[in-house]
Every structure is written in structure tokens, then in C-alpha cells.
């Protein structure tokens, strides 16, 4: 099962807003760009987009597999994620060797660093 529609960042203007004014957090294989929604009184659900370039892999099969793994990680972390955030996860070259547990650990660290998940 994929990431629920309500938690997906899909529109070009949303991506541009996050890229333009979002704050960046870097990991070894992932980069998180996050932006808090402009209406803090009534925050909507947090939404995420995934970006992966052909530098990571020329093969679409490999890129799609990595995106599915990241979506599964986000879905697992959703109960801990605060409402009212937009984020883009950029998959960097070298992520091909990573497994699900590595992505889970790294993305959780990035979300804690961005205060989207409150650290333990």
C-alpha cells in the first residue's frame, strides 16, 4: 500500500514553494527540504514529495523502487509526524545500496532535525 493521497505533495507550485523557501537538512543518502504551512492556527496534514534524478540510476525500475521504499518509510512514520508541514525528500546518488531500515533510520533523523518529529 502506498502513501495516502492526502499526504502527497503533487502540484508544481507546491514543489516550487518548498524548493524556494524551505530549509534543507542533509543526510548521507537523503536530503530533506521542509517548509511549515503558512496557517499555523489550523494546520492541515503534512504532505511529502519525492525527487530522484537520473544521476542516481539511469534505470526507471531502480528509481521507482527507491521511491516506493521512501513512501513506505513515510507511511510508517506518519503517526509521529506533526501536522502542517510540506517536505521534499531528495534521493542522492549512492542510495541504491541502502535498504529499508537504513532509509527509515536516516529519514527519522532528518525529520527530528527539522522538528517535524519531536526527538526521543
UniProtKB/Swiss-Prot annotation:
SS bond list: none
A Pfam family of this chain: Ribonuclease_P
SUPFAM superfamilies: Ribosomal protein S5 domain 2-like
InterPro entries assigned: Ribosomal_Su5_D2-typ_SF, Ribsml_uS5_D2-typ_fold_subgr, RNase_P, RNase_P_CS
Principal EC category: hydrolase
Example GO molecular function: tRNA binding
Catalytic activity: Endonucleolytic cleavage of RNA, removing 5'-extranucleotides from tRNA precursor
Top-level division of the source organism's lineage: Bacteria
The protein's assembly and partners: Consists of a catalytic RNA component (M1 or rnpB) and a protein subunit.
PANTHER family to which the protein is assigned, alphabetical: RIBONUCLEASE P PROTEIN COMPONENT
Role according to the record: RNaseP catalyzes the removal of the 5'-leader sequence from pre-tRNA to produce the mature 5'-terminus. It can also cleave other RNA substrates such as 4.5S RNA. The protein component plays an auxiliary but essential role in vivo by binding to the 5'-leader sequence and broadening the substrate specificity of the ribozyme.
Family, as annotated: Belongs to the RnpA family.
Protein name stated in the entry: Ribonuclease P protein component
Protein's organism: Microcystis aeruginosa (strain NIES-843 / IAM M-2473)
Amino acid at each position: 500500500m502506498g502513501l495516502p493521497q492526502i499526504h502527497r505533495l503533487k502540484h508544481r507550485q507546491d514543489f516550487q514553494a518548498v524548493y524556494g523557501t524551505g530549509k534543507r537538512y542533509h543526510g548521507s543518502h537523503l536530503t530533506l527540504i521542509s517548509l511549515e504551512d503558512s496557517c499555523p492556527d489550523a494546520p492541515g496534514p503534512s504532505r511529502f514529495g519525492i525527487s530522484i534524478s537520473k544521476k542516481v540510476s539511469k534505470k526507471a525500475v531502480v528509481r521507482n523502487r527507491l521511491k516506493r521504499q521512501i513512501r513506505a518509510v513515510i507511511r510508517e512514520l506518519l503517526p509521529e509526524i506533526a501536522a502542517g508541514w510540506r517536505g521534499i525528500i531528495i534521493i542522492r546518488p549512492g542510495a541504491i545500496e541502502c535498504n529499508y531500515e537504513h532509509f527509515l533510520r536516516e529519514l527519522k533523523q532528518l525529520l527530528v532535525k527539522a522538528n517535524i518529529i519531536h526527538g526521543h
